[in-house]
Amino acid sequence: MTDIGILPAPAIAYGALSPMLIMFGVAVVSVLVEAFVPRGHRLRTQLALATVGILGAFVAVVALSGSHQVVMNGAVAIDGPTLYLQGLILVASGLALVVMAQRRTVAAVPSAVGAGAGGGLDSFAAQASSVPGSEPERVLNRTGITQTEIFPLTLFAIAGMMLFPACNDLLTMFVALEVFSLPLYVMCALARRRRLLSQESALKYFLLGAFSSAFFLFGSAFVYGYAGTVELDAVARAVDADAGERSFLLLGVAMLSVGLLFKVGAVPFHFWVPDVYQGAPTPVTAFMAATTKIAAFGALLRVLYVALPGITTDWRPVLWGVAIATMLIGSIGAVTQTDVKRMLAYSAVAHTGFLLTGVAAANERGVSSTLFYLAAYGFSTVGAFIIAGLVRSGNADDGADGDYKDDDEVTDLRRWAGVGRRAPVLGIVFALFLLAFAGIPLTSGFVSKFAVFEAAAAGGAMPLVVVGVMCSAIAAYFYVRVIVVMFFADPVEDSGVLRIPGPAVTVSIAVSALITVLLGVAPQPLLDLVENLADFVT
């Protein structure tokens, strides 16, 4: 009788995988909370569970510092970039999650600056499936019932994002991509106000995201056809040996790039960014704008620097073109916007171009500068979107009738006139984030742009540096324009007001602002750290 071979199961390195296992475990428990915990106790339970999970995963990341190994039969790499990016994702997620946890009921109506004490700011529908203004929604609003499904969705997204930059083979990378993408599609549709716009943006994101994921999977198949493997280090060895049909490799890399460049929001795969950033609930926008970019750039760096260093001369010119187009279209597109969230979305596209400048440097300094830039940009982005979500129309509305027009978010730049003068502290902090985006000295943005430009120049990519400096000058215009409107324009009849944030949200804003200033005034400790960590395990 012939023995049937048994596929060996991979040895699970629980210690090395502990940050991701903690987040996946907490996400599963969060689903059980939704099923079994009474509705009245879910919010506190979910918030406590998420807090414990994020803190536990962060402690596990710190405990693994210095680890340099490949586990799960080559599927997952635990090294400096992995742990650094996982730490960034956890901290940025924690800051955004605080805002997601804000809830209000009919009895707790938020107040405008100068009009009394502040309250919670609820950005999420009581029941996303109900028609806006319908009787079921009115009943839910009157009873103070709020949905908490956002917590398990967010936790699964965080877990997938932590796995994404750690993946050492293309199939695991695809699974991680879907694990964090699918919750984001749903989260974008949960807005309490402007529900149809929110659902439209989610549908666009889902359709385009599915399309890009198909390209990624198809590209993985072509790379496998070339190398006979999907492990990144084995692909690199096959490339060095020129072991297969080169056209398969180049076509596969092109398709992989479509999937990855879509996630970072690079031109020409950026069209979803303005619509989704505008339509999604602002706390979700803050979360995804920072963490998705961190995770996706980590995966892009690993693919290019671990699997494809042997064909740098092939992918580098293409990346140059993508970076230049992304910087130009992002900067010019932002100038034409009159909606603050869409302006910040085009700003995010431009920053993707700056980050690609560091990636295209194709040297170790390019990796370290990109890692630094991700930290600087991530925290400024979270803080900026949190404050943007606090600008509301002037009259508080209890929402008992299901109509929240009187407490809608104000994103029309014209209606931001005088907002900074009416709430000077929050206005100054928001101006700080905008100046950091512009790359003004003594902010994190200046140091991060200088770092990627220096790396690109050292790698012989001076055209990218020239375009980057030019686009930074263009960007300064639209950032300063917002500041001028906030502080120097006379208020209009329907000007918005800044709601007073609660203590937890205030802490999130303060932490984001503090990091933005520290990375601009004293960046050397983090620069030294990323230089020591910029070494991928192979």
Curated annotation (Swiss-Prot):
It catalyses: a quinone + NADH + 5 H(+)(in) = a quinol + NAD(+) + 4 H(+)(out). Keywords: Cell membrane, Membrane, NAD, Quinone, Translocase, Transmembrane, Transmembrane helix, Transport. One of its GO terms (biological process) is ATP synthesis coupled electron transport. The chain crosses the membrane at residues 12-32, 47-67, 81-101, 144-164, 170-190, 205-225, 248-268, 294-314, 317-337, 343-363, 371-391, 423-443, 472-492, 502-522. One of its GO terms (molecular function) is NADH:ubiquinone reductase (non-electrogenic) activity. The keyword Cell membrane applies. It is an enzyme of class 7 (translocase). It is a multi-pass membrane protein. It is found in: Cell membrane. InterPro entries: NADH-Q_OxRdtase_suN/2, ND/Mrp_TM. Pfam families: Proton_antipo_M. GO terms for cellular component: plasma membrane. Its EC number is 7.1.1.-. It comes from the Bacteria. NCBIfam families: NDH_I_N, PRK05777.1-4. NDH-1 shuttles electrons from NADH, via FMN and iron-sulfur (Fe-S) centers, to quinones in the respiratory chain. The immediate electron acceptor for the enzyme in this species is believed to be a menaquinone. Couples the redox reaction to proton translocation (for every two electrons transferred, four hydrogen ions are translocated across the cytoplasmic membrane), and thus conserves the redox energy in a proton gradient. PANTHER family: NADH DEHYDROGENASE. NDH-1 is composed of 14 different subunits. Subunits NuoA, H, J, K, L, M, N constitute the membrane sector of the complex. Belongs to the complex I subunit 2 family. This is NADH-quinone oxidoreductase subunit N.
